[in-house]
UniProtKB/Swiss-Prot annotation:
Role description: Binds to and stimulates the transcription of the CCAAT-containing, cold-shock-inducible promoters of the H-NS and GyrA proteins. Also binds to the inverted repeat 5'-ATTGG-3'.
Keywords tagged on the record: Activator, Cytoplasm, DNA-binding, Stress response, Transcription, Transcription regulation
Residues covered by the CSD domain: 7-67
Gene name per UniProt: cspA
Predominant location category: cytoplasm
Subcellular location(s) per record: Cytoplasm
A GO biological process held by the record: positive regulation of DNA-templated transcription
SUPFAM superfamilies attached to this UniProt entry: Nucleic acid-binding proteins (SSF50249)
Organism field: Escherichia coli (strain K12)
Keyword hit for Transport: no
Cellular component aspect of the GO annotation: cytosol
Molecular functions (GO terms): DNA binding; nucleic acid binding; RNA binding; single-stranded DNA binding; single-stranded RNA binding; transcription antitermination factor activity, RNA binding
InterPro entries: Cold_shock_CspA, Cold_shock_domain, CSD, CSD_CS, CSP_DNA-bd, NA-bd_OB-fold
Listed name of the protein: Cold shock protein CspA
Induction behaviour: In response to low temperature (at protein level).
Amino acid sequence: MSGKMTGIVKWFNADKGFGFITPDDGSKDVFVHFSAIQNDGYKSLDEGQKVSFTIESGAKGPAAGNVTSL
């Protein structure tokens, strides 16, 4: 849907496995599911963490995909 974007993790609930990323370009916050995180091992994000991601078409609207830590 679009190229790589960068943003900051607004919040992430590790127990439920999802959260939101605030894009650096000022666009609307993007839903992120743990399955989109490209880390080895435990897939979680920290509040305030800088990440890069793509926008995918999720079941309930736009969602982050290919999420990697910067």
